[in-house]
């Protein structure tokens, strides 16, 4: 069987809030995780980002996207590389597994992120305004040193301590729609 855990997030919020939780699937197929890590090492990542109408050099994270069809980058327009799932076989196996486990056909696209210096870079607190369905597949030895941190916010201020969820090499993290943070810009509700 699988080693799965539901992490309840709502009890951490001191004010009334919608139910939120995350599913963590630990250690599925170490062989697939090893192959996925190996394949990500040879990717030519995009090192730019598009913010506030401008293309800038990305210092905190580098990325490429994955989907059924490939697409070349257009840096001057802020359009990132899309690699075909067929060229990311181990990642595609992981996607097929978690899609089947969740009984969903909605995991069509992915984003492969690389943090150039795991000890000095990361991203700040934010929600995901574009996606309600999000799955994270963590690979790499540094995973154990970098848990996922979640926090409840209201009116732009934190209303609880960070909720840390440790993830290891080959673990999946599946937040509920509320935990994804699609409403993160709505300041009045946690």
Please report, for each region that a protein language model flagged, where it lies by residue.
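Non-heme Fe(II) oxygenase metal-center motifs and adjacent flexible, charged/small-residue loops
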Residues: 1-190
């Amino acid at each position: 069987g699988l080693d799965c855990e539901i992490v309840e997030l709502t009890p951490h919020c001191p004010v009334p809030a919608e139910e939120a939780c995350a599913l963590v699937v630990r250690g599925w197929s170490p062989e697939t995780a090893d192959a996925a890590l190996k394949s990500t090492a040879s990717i030519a990542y995009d090192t730019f980002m598009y913010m506030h109408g401008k293309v800038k050099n990305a210092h905190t994270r580098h990325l490429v996207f994955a989907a059924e069809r490939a697409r070349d980058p257009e840096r001057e327009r802020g359009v990132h590389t899309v690699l075909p799932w067929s060229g990311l076989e181990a990642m595609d196996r992981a996607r097929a597994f978690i899609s089947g486990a969740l009984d969903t056909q909605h995991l069509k696209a992915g984003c492969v992120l690389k943090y150039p210096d795991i000890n000095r870079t990361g991203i700040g607190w934010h929600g995901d305004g574009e996606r309600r369905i999000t799955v994270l597949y963590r690979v790499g030895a540094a995973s154990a040193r970098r848990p996922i941190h979640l926090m409840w916010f209201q009116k732009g201020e934190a209303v609880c301590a960070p909720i840390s969820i440790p993830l290891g090499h080959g673990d999946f993290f599946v937040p509920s729609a509320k935990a994804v943070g699609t409403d993160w810009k709505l300041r009045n509700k946690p």
